[in-house]
Regions:
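Short glycine/proline- and acidic residue-enriched helix-loop micro-motifs
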Residues: 250-251, 263, 369-373, 441-443
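Luminal/periplasmic acceptor-recognition loop/helix of membrane-associated glycosyltransferases
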Residues: 382-405, 416-525
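Membrane-integral, polyisoprenol-dependent glycosyltransferases
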Residues: 1-350, 412, 416
């Protein structure tokens, strides 16, 4: 059936309105901790430093992930100023990319109505509207994985030669996926495509793909940073690829251990109430029973792609003990399409079309309420209140210490242009090797010992010099601190103290030199 131009305009209007709603939600809450505070400030440091090779947290190299998020955030901050919203614009742009590419692919594979309903289902879901404006790497890699799979799948047109241009777009998406979050950026699209091509009897057609040009394009996009980084930091490959990829995947010493059922429950929640359609209408068992007679039919290729995509990635992330909600985002587009197909079956059975509008409204309301609640929760843990006080009181040569914790959002909201001194028992932290903020900092200091000089022992805050500030959790026993500190401001989660001492500042404890070349605008004195 051919649809009039008005139907396509309606579809694009749906895409635009859902994306605008996501951008509005992004304004309504402070940075969540630890992720958003951490990653937003890494992008800010990149803008200040002008060092596009080494992402830095508090001036210390931070190589947990490749740098695409930080590059794009630095560009966003430069163009729009430093704010939580401009930080969130980067994942929001990728969420928009995910929505647009899914719409175009579903329109090609199925129909205009299925494509538009897929957009409405995905774009109104909790998983999309929250993760799409959450500052971390997950939405970026999910968008590029999705684009790679769609492009590769669309390139295998029935009874035709493989589309070279779409294949090259798929290779490019794999390159950006690698720069977003590492190996999964090309491993997962490859896994899905191999399984799908084998299932549908098309694997022999991979010979038609532009492998040489594709691999060259992928290499030009993704490899220069890894090569240059390895040349300057000899342990980069071992730390980023071996430690942060393979060790985390097979190890049991990291955070967030969950059972095999975890992602099934997460997906039901992320897509609620749309997920009720999956539970009632989409039965993998029934789909598997027809494989002998129908799996190679072109009419079945779209649905088989969606199921294989969902199952392969879900199983891949269910194997390790450590499981994080955002990992499963690449599964949302195929599930949204499966739900749209399920809705078509509901209509055939005579169900009222009005139920779609009801579920759409419920989904949007749930997303808005959860975003509001997330903001309340984040505000209770945020250091934004004392950061704004500090920004208006601090002098250029003042020194800021933190102890008994690390408020990731403090440097971001206070717009600090020098690193914070972090005063804890670092020897004990290295012995315990707990997977938390201390490990991020001392492992990063191994790459740059000069930058690591801001990691000081607790005794450094016993006799503060004039112009020193101290930030500590609100529940700290003030009696345990030196009498040379006095409370300057108390926030909801953190307390700001100022040094009473008039000691002359020791030049040996000056903030270590960094690559920063300019300060960001902060409160006028």
């Amino acid at each position: 059936m051919k649809f009039a131009l008005g139907d396509r305009k309606t579809s694009w209007l749906c895409v635009a309105m859902l994306w605008i709603f996501l951008l509005i939600l992004a304004v309504l809450r402070p940075l969540s901790l630890p992720d958003e505070g951490r990653y937003a400030d890494v992008g800010r440091w990149m803008l200040m430093s002008g060092d596009w090779l080494a992402p830095r947290l508090n001036g210390i190299p931070f190589f947990h992930k490749p740098p695409l998020l930080h590059w794009l955030q630095a560009i966003s901050f430069s163009a729009l100023g430093v704010s939580a919203w401009s930080a969130r614009l980067v994942p929001a742009m990728h969420a928009g990319l995910m929505l647009v590419v899914m719409y175009l692919a579903a329109r090609t594979f199925a129909s205009e109505r299925v494509a538009r309903n897929s957009v409405l289902i995905l774009g109104s879901s909790v998983g999309f509207l929250i993760s799409g404006q959450y500052v971390n790497h997950d939405m970026l890699v999910a968008a590029w994985i999705s684009m790679a799979i769609w492009c590769f799948a669309l390139s295998f047109k029935p009874s035709q030669h493989v589309d070279v241009n779409l294949s090259l777009l798929g290779f490019a998406a794999c390159g950006f996926g690698l720069l977003s979050k590492g190996l999964i950026g090309f491993v997962l699209p490859g896994l899905v495509m191999v399984c799908w091509l084998l299932w549908t009897g098309q694997f022999g057609r991979v010979r038609q793909m532009p492998w040489i040009r594709g691999i060259l394009l992928w290499s030009v996009i993704s490899l220069p940073w890894f090569v240059l980084g390895q040349m300057k930091y000899s342990e980069l490959f071992n730390y980023l690829i071996i430690g942060q990829h393979f060790a985390r995947y097979v190890g049991d010493q990291f955070n967030n251990p969950w059972g095999w059922w975890f992602y099934g429950a997460v997906l039901v929640a992320m897509l609620f109430p749309w997920s009720l359609l999956i539970l009632q209408d989409l039965r993998p068992k029934a789909w598997l029973m027809v494989w002998q007679t129908e799996r190679k039919l072109a009419a079945r290729h779209f649905e088989s792609l969606l199921w294989i995509w969902t199952l392969c990635i879900s199983l891949f992330f269910s194997l390790p003990q450590s499981k994080i909600v955002g990992y499963i985002l690449p599964v949302l587009p195929p599930l949204a399409c499966l739900l749209a197909l399920a809705w078509e079956k509901w209509l055939v059975r005579g169900q009222s079309a009005a139920w779609f509008k009801v579920m759409l409204l419920v989904s949007l309301v749930i997303s808005g309420v959860l975003n509001w609640q997330a903001g309340i929760y984040s505000e209770k843990r945020s250091s934004k209140d004392i950061a704004l006080v500090l920004a208006c009181a601090i002098e250029p040569k003042d020194r800021v210490y933190v102890t008994h914790g690390y408020p990731y959002d403090l440097p971001f909201y206070a717009q600090l242009s020098a690193p914070i001194f972090v005063a804890i028992n670092w020897q004990q932290a290295r012995i315990e090797q707990i997977d938390n903020w201390t490990r991020e900092l001392y492992e990063g200091a191994n790459f740059d010992q000069t930058a690591g000089q801001v990691l000081v022992q607790e005794s450094a805050i016993d006799d503060p010099v004039q112009g020193s500030w101290l930030v500590a959790p609100n529940d700290i026993q003030l009696q345990s601190l030196s009498a040379n500190w006095s409370v300057y401001s108390r926030g909801k989660a953190w307390v700001l103290l100022r040094a009473r001492s008039t000691s002359v500042q020791d030049s040996s404890l000056e903030s270590p030199p960094t690559a920063q070349g300019k300060s960001l605008k902060r409160c006028n004195h």
